[in-house]
Structure formats: structure tokens, C-alpha cells
Amino acid sequence: MAKKKALVPFFYLTSIVFLPWLISLCCNKSLKTWITNWWNTRQCETFLNDIQEKSVLEKFIQLEELFQLDEMIKEYPETDLHQFRLGIHKETIQFIKIHNEYRIHTILHFSTNLISFVILSGYSFLGKEKLFILNSWVQEFLYNLSDTIKAFSILLLTDLCIGFHSPHGWELMIGYIYKDFGFAHYEQILSGLVSTFPVILDTIFKYWIFRYLNRVSPSLVVIYHAIND
């Protein structure tokens, strides 16, 4: 009986890990058809942000240049104008289809992430007791580690998050999150977040060492600085 109770938090932790994937799979299957029909039948107003408007305008400028070229070649009767105009018409229709698919993809991913957040928040709130048990296990495990291993682990974690090569990892992670929410890629926003996040984390970490570790385990701070130097 005690063994079963001990396994309950592990099952709960496993469910938290796989629940977002399951929610995403179910929402993508159930919501995609509904959102597609809603978008196509309601002809809803587009809610483009500045970045997406810029992308759309660039596409329309390209089409406008094609139309200007169409006007220019009217001077040459031997050119097959009908085929050329037909090609422009097909490109315009294709662009509209791609734009609609992109908008549907954005709404679908944003809705899925919002639903996942709400469900996981409620699931975590209902399982507070299990989370408390897991937290106590983690604290006990960390407490039993030697100061050398703790210092090495902290150093490894900080190098991964705020080290010399960390910006590339942050760029990949933030870019993935940005894409997962369906937002258009914007280099200036991405580079701004990548350059800001490590600095904020570095400040928080130094404050944590100064206020918490110096009080709880001064020997750990000494070992950490010795390894870091």
C-alpha cells in the first residue's frame, strides 16, 4: 500500500510531461476543421500585426510589379498576353490561399496553447498535494548531494543558460516558442529577446547567490567560486 502511494507522484509527474502533447494532438484534430470553416464562412476581419502587414505588403508589391510589367509588354503584340495574365491570376489565388492557411495556422496554435495552459493550470492546482510530495523529494535529493557536486551542477547550468555559447541556444528556443504560437519571424524582436534574457538571468542568479546561498551554505559559495575561477 505504501509503495503504491509512493508511485502516485511519479505517475502524476509523467502525466504532466505527456499531457501537453496529448492536449495539442486532440486540439489540432478537433479545432482545425472548426477554425477553417469559421475563417472561410465568416470572412472575419484580419487581425494582422505590423510584422505580418509588412509581409503581406511585400507580396502585394511583387504582384503590383508584375502588373506593371504586364502594362509594359502590351507594346509588344507578339507576346502571349493571355498566358501571362493567366499566370498572374494563378499567383494571386495561390498567395491568397497561402495567406488564409497561415492565418488559420496562427489561430489554431494560439488556441491550442491557451487551452493547454488552462488545463495544465487546473490540473496542477488539483494535484497540489502530489506536487508538494515531489518538491520534498527533490529538496531531499539535493540536500544529500555534496557541496562539490552542487557547485559543479550550478556552474554547468549557468554556463548553459548565460554562458558564452548560450545566445545560440536561446535563439533556437525562443524561435521555436515564437513559431509554436504562430507568430511571424521577426529578426529584431528575436535578437532583442536573445540579448536580454541571459542578462536578466545572470542578474537574478547573482542576487540568489548573494542573498540565499551565502546564508544557507557559505562553503558551497566558496567551492563554486573556486571552480569558476
Curated annotation (Swiss-Prot):
Role played: Contributes to K(+)/H(+) antiport activity by supporting proton efflux to control proton extrusion and homeostasis in chloroplasts in a light-dependent manner to modulate photosynthesis. Prevents excessive induction of non-photochemical quenching (NPQ) under continuous-light conditions. Indirectly promotes efficient inorganic carbon uptake into chloroplasts.
Organism: Lobularia maritima (Sweet alyssum)
InterPro entries: CemA (IPR004282)
Bilayer-spanning residue ranges: 6-26, 107-127, 189-209
Highest taxon above the source species: Eukaryota
Protein name stated in the entry: Potassium/proton antiporter CemA
Membrane association type: Multi-pass membrane protein
GO cellular component annotations of the record: chloroplast inner membrane
Signal sequence segment: none
Location of this chain's protein in the cell: Plastid, Chloroplast inner membrane
Tagged with keyword Iron: no
Keywords on record: Antiport, Chloroplast, Hydrogen ion transport, Ion transport, Membrane, Plastid, Plastid inner membrane, Potassium, Potassium transport, Transmembrane, Transmembrane helix, Transport
Reactions listed under catalytic activity: K(+)(in) + H(+)(out) = K(+)(out) + H(+)(in)
Record's keyword annotation contains Chloroplast: yes
Family per record: Belongs to the CemA family.
